[in-house]
């Protein structure tokens, strides 16, 4: 890639940032496409990748005219009607191939699962910036990816401590609204001055529902009160598992101990997160619940550009409310904290188990309250082991946990 200082962070008139978008057909991927297409002067889309949505990928390729596309379904990839000159990239390493292309400056990772770890590490190793919405990258692999990001930042700091790229977050950029908010609150601040990170949560659709959640249906759980998201993350929001995963992400992203990461229920979803400093000050980032905002910030850092999202109308909102999370009623948050403290192996077990448990709930083979029970069982069984796992060990653990679910070794 070209040096970030020559391709990014120079405001209007800079050379377009060359982007590879992995996971372009999912919820985050489609919104990323909207952001990229809205700023053709700022971005050139070099590569697109998707898992199975061939039709959507084909439409995106026609719209953005990338140099290369990849699709998990290689038969469908061969049949795609692509613009003249667009290369088809297949194989198990397709995401890695796209992530390290010489004509790529920034890689958006909107794919799910532990399979995203390899392309993230490959991209950073190639000195490409990564903007990630993939939770597994940090929850299970934070011990693998953050040292690479910190090394890149350290090299830049040695030359100029004021360089925006002297910060690991300039290399591994969070797309989550909460982590984007904390990142923005920390700009210009030193970590020794930070007392605590405050992750806000809407509380989901069952915040004030009757106490018994065992009979909750998938349709009810998918009715998020403020955000429009994919099914998996919407269910995770309802159980508060999503917030637990974000606690683990925060630990790795900001190198902050778990005792200094707090969760606050904020039903209006206006404050996306906040930072409390040692002098008693509190800095928060406010915005409408629109994922295009954190996506765009991750792409344009350290600059800001006009966005299709609107700013919050504080007078119209009127008031903001806050409360502590009820971890007895939503135990997934507690289980996630415990997994994070145990280490990467337990965190990996947590996130794989959650993926399978949510799929079972959506298929109506597991009750809503069974989700945290399965998470706790997986962490207890698979969360302890020697040393910190590498990528191969994490992928092996993924297969082992899925096999345990399939054979009934872990029940609901």
Question: Where on the chain are the PLM-derived regions?
Answer:
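Catalytic, metal-anchored helix/loop core of enzyme active sites in primary metabolism
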Residues: 1-412
């Amino acid at each position: 890639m070209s040096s970030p200082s020559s391709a990014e962070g120079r405001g209007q008139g800079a050379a377009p940032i060359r982007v590879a978008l992995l996971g372009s057909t999912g919820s985050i991927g489609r919104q990323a496409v909207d952001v990229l297409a809205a700023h053709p002067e700022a971005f050139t889309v070099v590569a697109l990748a998707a898992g199975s949505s061939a039709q959507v990928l084909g439409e995106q390729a026609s719209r953005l005219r990338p140099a290369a596309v990849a699709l998990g379904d290689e038969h469908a990839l061969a049949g795609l009607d692509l613009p003249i000159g667009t290369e088809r990239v297949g194989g198990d390493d397709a995401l890695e191939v796209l992530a390290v292309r010489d004509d790529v400056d920034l890689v958006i990772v909107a794919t799910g699962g532990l399979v995203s770890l390899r392309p993230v590490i490959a991209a950073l190793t190639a000195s490409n910036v990564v903007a990630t919405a993939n939770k597994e990258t940090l929850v299970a692999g934070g011990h693998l990816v953050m040292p690479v990001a910190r090394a890149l930042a350290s090299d830049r700091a040695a030359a100029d401590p004021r360089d925006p790229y002297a910060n690991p977050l300039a290399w591994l950029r969070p797309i989550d609204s909460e982590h984007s908010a904390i990142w923005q609150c920390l700009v210009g601040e030193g970590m020794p001055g930070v007392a605590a990170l405050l992750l806000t949560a809407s509380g989901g659709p069952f915040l004030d529902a009757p106490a018994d959640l065992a009979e909750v249906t998938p349709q009810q759980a998918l009715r998020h009160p403020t955000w429009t998201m994919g099914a998996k993350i919407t269910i995770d929001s309802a159980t508060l598992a999503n917030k637990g995963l974000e606690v683990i992400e925060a630990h790795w992203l900001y190198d902050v101990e778990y005792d200094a990461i707090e969760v606050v229920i904020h039903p209006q979803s206006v404050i996306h997160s906040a930072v409390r400093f040692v002098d008693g000050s509190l800095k928060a980032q406010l915005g409408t619940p629109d994922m295009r905002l954190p996506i765009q910030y991750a792409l344009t850092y350290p600059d800001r550009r006009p966005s299709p999202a609107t700013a919050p109308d504080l007078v119209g909102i009127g008031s903001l409310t806050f409360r502590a999370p009820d971890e007895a009623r939503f135990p997934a948050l507690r289980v996630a904290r415990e997994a994070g403290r145990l280490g990467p192996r337990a965190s990996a077990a947590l996130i794989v188990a959650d993926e399978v448990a949510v799929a079972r709930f959506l298929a109506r083979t597991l009750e809503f309250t069974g989700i945290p029970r399965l998470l706790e069982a997986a962490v207890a069984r698979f969360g302890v082991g020697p040393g910190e796992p590498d990528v191969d060990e994490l992928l092996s653990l993924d297969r082992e946990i899925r096999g345990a679910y399939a054979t009934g070794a872990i029940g609901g």
